[in-house]
UniProtKB/Swiss-Prot annotation:
Subunit (UniProt): Part of the 30S ribosomal subunit. Forms a tight complex with proteins S10 and S14.
GO molecular function: mRNA binding; rRNA binding; structural constituent of ribosome
Taxonomic path: Bacteria, Bacillati, Bacillota, Bacilli, Lactobacillales
Biological role: Binds the lower part of the 30S subunit head. Binds mRNA in the 70S ribosome, positioning it for translation.
A single cellular component GO annotation: cytosolic small ribosomal subunit
One Pfam match: KH_2
Protein name: Small ribosomal subunit protein uS3
Keywords: Ribonucleoprotein, Ribosomal protein, RNA-binding, rRNA-binding
Gene Ontology biological process: translation
KH type-2 domain boundaries: 39-115
Species of origin: Leuconostoc citreum (strain KM20)
Entry similarity comment: Belongs to the universal ribosomal protein uS3 family.
InterPro entries: KH_dom (IPR004087), KH_dom-like_a/b (IPR015946), KH_dom_type_2 (IPR004044), KH_sf_prok-type (IPR009019), Ribosomal_S3_C_sf (IPR036419), Ribosomal_uS3_bac-typ (IPR005704), Ribosomal_uS3_C (IPR001351), Ribosomal_uS3_CS (IPR018280)
């Protein structure tokens, strides 16, 4: 089962938390879900060069939306004197539904810095995709990503690239693995991502698994 299922979804509720934290009744659920999709799509499009890994959305009340942006380049997102993050907050507020009085929801943005981007599967996948789009040999791009992740402290990494590699007429799959990637172990902190590279010969799929160690449950002190 661990070989087939998405490693991130497999561990939600065990060692990972949801990226969307809110509850809604039947009447409001669809509207809030589409709000989330608009917010995520806008951030991914406008901060494509800011190395954004995750976007967390939390709603404590119906009129408040808290957005946490995990990025390896916080300075690019914040801007000089916080100008860029204020522009982002204003634009995200316009994407929310208005209340009965025509007012937009209050949006609060929290920037979370990723100190080791080479341990983020999504950022590693984006790096490989960028190399492939710049016509770097796929083996060189994959091995370079594996070496950087290993130097950053990864216990294991697996990278898989599929498609018309090097412009071949027949599509195929190539993969490299370094260390161990225990997909069946729920306590194993495995980050997974699927990315896409758009080349002159077609799109290439990139799957990345990074094993960052185990997350053990904390023991509760008995009184």
């Amino acid at each position: 089962m661990g070989q087939k299922i998405n490693p991130t979804g497999f561990r939600v509720g065990v060692i990972r938390d949801w990226d969307a934290k809110w509850f809604a009744d039947k009447a409001d659920y669809a509207n809030q879900l589409h709000e989330d999709l608009r917010i995520r799509k806008y951030i991914e499009k406008n901060l494509a060069d800011a190395a954004v890994d995750r976007i967390e959305i939390e709603r404590s009340t119906k009129s408040r939306v808290d957005v946490s942006v995990h990025t390896a380049k916080p300075g690019m997102v914040i801007g000089k004197g916080g100008s860029e993050v204020e522009k982002l907050r204003t634009q995200l507020a316009k994407l929310t539904d208005r209340d009965e009085k025509g007012r937009s929801k209050r949006v609060f943005i929290n920037i979370v810095e990723i100190k080791k981007p080479d341990l983020s599967a999504h950022l590693v996948g984006q790096q490989i995709a960028g190399d492939l789009e710049r016509r770097v040999a796929f083996r060189r791009a994959m091995r370079g990503a594996i070496q950087r992740a290993t130097r950053s402290g990864a216990k294991g990494i697996k990278v898989m690239v599929s498609g018309r590699l090097n412009g071949a007429d027949i599509a195929r799959i190539e993969q490299y693995t370094e260390g161990t990637v225990p997909l069946h172990t729920l306590r194993a902190d495995i980050d997974y991502s699927w990315d896409e590279a758009m080349t002159a010969y077609g799109n290439l799929g990139i799957k990345t698994w990074i094993y960052r160690g185990d997350i053990l449950p904390q023991k509760k002190n008995s009184k």
